[in-house]
């Protein structure tokens, strides 16, 4: 039952249908203090039309409105406050939750495709904590988009091309030990990459050697291509192990190399439209009227040596994806520092006459640090993501052993809790904020953590198991505790929360909702004896089951498991 819509309709009827229904619906609020009503309607915006004080308009609406579905409607100053008939509402809400697997989902995106560029680790380097944010934010946004009816295409735009591969090959040829590399491929390749970067600070010939090997790779030299393919193969194998643990999958793994033969057509297209200008031997696109001066109003398409730039490759990929997928939106889940780059790309596409560039969005996010330090492969201070997941699993196992020493499948649950802690911690803050990682804190079963929400779900499932009942809703809800009403109100907000999370491309909205629902339930559990065999138990168990269902559904939106026992 959509009370926001019902209230807007009833108000419009009272006002003789003189207002736009959608505009009225957007004005309906949910008061933070439930004593002021379950919903409230501010009348300030109606004052100009009726030439009356908002307080008078509120009184008129409260006196004349149809009160069906409401226990009470009253004016408080300029607000009209609505109090729902709680038993009837709760009964209908829980039926919607428990009898439909897709509660909260909608079809607003039916028939539309969303392309999501996410994760994008570099070949021959381990997946580090630096890749976590793009990966889990992209996965969560994909799940949220699907909950809003869209079809998603997740693309892992692998960093599998560039001069760094020339350096990697040069380092391998100089210092590579096949025995060590075969034993631990990516770690050894990283050591070689760090070493050649350090050595090249004093030996400039190493950079020249790297450039020469990359030129061989571009020209299809068999040895260079063989080594490049090997670097890629061992990297993808390690990446997949991490993705499996995070529950992340992709529809395309087309990386930078895929677009090697697609960039020259882009250059020719820009030239044919008179958009290219020569500047000191380089070819540029001038964007003075589309971007402010501090946003790089000149985009270099080709360097003076003929080499293409990242933006050339991104233009090629954007055009290819538009032609291949006919997307409604194309999202790039990339760090906030890349905003100017994507502004440039969109501006060039619009200059070229591609109005669909407006459907491209940069989904930026803040930096991630470990103990206040940024991570860099060149300097060697990287934190492999697999190590973080291993440590999180171990810390979760210790928590589980302490709280539930006899738990079956404890290792499996520890993996779910550890990985869930890492993912939830990343997603619970506004994605534009930077986050610092503290593993000891994020695996705790208390506080604003993923394990706290998971533990709440497990606790609620335990209550249902102890009740010995399966088909709980068969008699309906006949009673609603005063202390339970915040839970009911929170559950009813789930569908709108899913819409808002998609509108803002913001997974933290889901995470914050789940924390609030978990706190509401735990407060209720602390003050209410649920498993008491009386006329109230059935209604209370139905509520518990509703909480279980929504917690599990919400965690799934974030890519976090919901263990039944912890």
Swiss-Prot record:
EC code: 6.1.1.19
Give the enzyme's main class according to its UniProt record, as a single word: ligase
Keywords associated with the record: Aminoacyl-tRNA synthetase, ATP-binding, Cytoplasm, Ligase, Nucleotide-binding, Protein biosynthesis
The subcellular location is: Cytoplasm
InterPro entries, per database record: Arg-tRNA-ligase, Arg-tRNA-synth_N, Arg-tRNA-synth_N_sf, ArgRS_core, DALR_anticod-bd, Rossmann-like_a/b/a_fold, tRNAsynth_Ia_anticodon-bd
GO cellular component terms listed in the entry, alphabetical order: cytoplasm
Please state the protein's primary subcellular location.
cytoplasm
Q: Which CDD domains match?
A: Anticodon_Ia_Arg (cd07956), ArgRS_core (cd00671)
ATP-binding recorded as keyword:
yes
Origin: domain of life: Bacteria
Please indicate the residue ranges that the annotation assigns to the motif 'HIGH' region: 121-131
Give any GO molecular function from the UniProt entry.
ATP binding
Query: Could you provide one GO biological process annotation from this protein's UniProt record?
Result: arginyl-tRNA aminoacylation
Q: Which Pfam families match?
A: Arg_tRNA_synt_N (PF03485), DALR_1 (PF05746), tRNA-synt_1d (PF00750)
Q: Family assignment?
A: Belongs to the class-I aminoacyl-tRNA synthetase family.
Q: How does it assemble?
A: Monomer.
Query: Per its record, how is this protein called by name?
Result: Arginine--tRNA ligase
Native species of this protein?
A: Oenococcus oeni (strain ATCC BAA-331 / PSU-1)
Gene name linked to the record: argS
């Amino acid at each position: 039952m959509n009370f926001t819509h019902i209230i807007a309709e009833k108000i419009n009827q009272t006002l003789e249908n003189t207002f736009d229904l959608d505009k009225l619906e957007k004005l309906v609020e949910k008061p933070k203090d439930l004593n002021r009503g379950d919903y409230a309607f501010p009348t300030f915006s109606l004052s100009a039309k009726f030439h009356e004080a908002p307080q008078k308009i509120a009184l008129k609406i409260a006196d004349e409105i149809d009160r069906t579905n409401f226990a009470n409607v009253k004016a408080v100053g300029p607000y009209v406050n609505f109090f729902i008939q709680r038993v009837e509402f709760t009964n209908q809400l829980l039926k919607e939750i428990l009898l439909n697997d897709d509660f909260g989902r909608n079809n607003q995106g039916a028939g539309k495709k969303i392309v999501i560029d996410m994760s994008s680790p570099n070949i021959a380097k381990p997946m580090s904590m630096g890749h976590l944010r793009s990966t889990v934010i992209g996965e969560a946004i994909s799940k949220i988009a699907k909950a809003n009816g869209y079809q998603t295409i997740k693309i892992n735009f692998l960093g599998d091309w560039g001069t760094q591969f020339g350096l990697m090959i040069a380092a391998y040829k100089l210092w590579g030990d096949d025995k060590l590399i075969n034993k631990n491929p990516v770690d050894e390749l990283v050591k070689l990459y760090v070493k050649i970067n350090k050595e090249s600070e004093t030996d400039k010939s190493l950079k020249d050697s790297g450039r020469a090997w990359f030129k061989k790779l571009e020209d299809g030299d068999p040895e260079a291509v063989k080594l490049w393919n090997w670097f890629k193969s061992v990297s993808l194998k390690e990446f997949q192990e991490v993705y499996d643990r995070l529950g992340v999958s992709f529809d395309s793994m087309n990386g930078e190399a895929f677009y090697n033969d697609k960039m020259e057509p882009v250059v020719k297209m820009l030239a044919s439209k008179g958009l290219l200008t020569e500047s000191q031997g380089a070819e540029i696109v001038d964007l003075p009227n589309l971007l402010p001066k501090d946003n790089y109003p000149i985009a270099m398409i080709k360097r003076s040596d003929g080499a293409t730039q990242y933006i050339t490759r991104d233009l090629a990929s954007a055009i290819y994806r538009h032609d291949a997928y006919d997307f409604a939106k194309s999202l790039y889940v990339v760090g906030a520092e890349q905003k100017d780059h994507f502004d440039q790309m969109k501006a060039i596409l619009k200059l070229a006459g591609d109005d669909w560039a407006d459907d491209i969005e940069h989904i930026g996010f803040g930096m991630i640090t470990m103990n206040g330090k940024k991570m860099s492969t060149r300097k060697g201070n990287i934190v492999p993501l697999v190590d973080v997941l291993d440590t999180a699993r171990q810390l979760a196992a210790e928590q589980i052993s302490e709280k539930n020493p006899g738990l079956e499948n404890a290792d499996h649950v520890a993996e779910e809790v550890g990985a869930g802690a890492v993912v939830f911690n990343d997603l619970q803050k506004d994605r534009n904020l930077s986050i610092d990682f503290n593993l000891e804190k994020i695996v705790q079963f208390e506080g604003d953590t993923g394990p706290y929400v998971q533990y709440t779900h497990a606790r609620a499932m335990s209550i249902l198991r102890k009740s010995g009942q399966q088909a709980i809703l068969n008699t309906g809800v006949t009673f609603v505790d005063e202390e339970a009403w915040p839970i009911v109100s929170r559950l009813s907000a789930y569908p709108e929360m899913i819409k808002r999370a998609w509108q803002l491309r913001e997974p933290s909205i889901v995470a914050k909702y789940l924390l609030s629902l978990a706190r509401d339930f735990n407060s209720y559990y602390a003050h209410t004896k649920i498993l008491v065999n009386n006329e109230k138990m059935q209604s209370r168990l139905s509520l518990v089951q509703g909480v279980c269902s929504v917690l599990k559904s919400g965690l799934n939106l974030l890519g976090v498991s919901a263990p039944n026992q912890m």
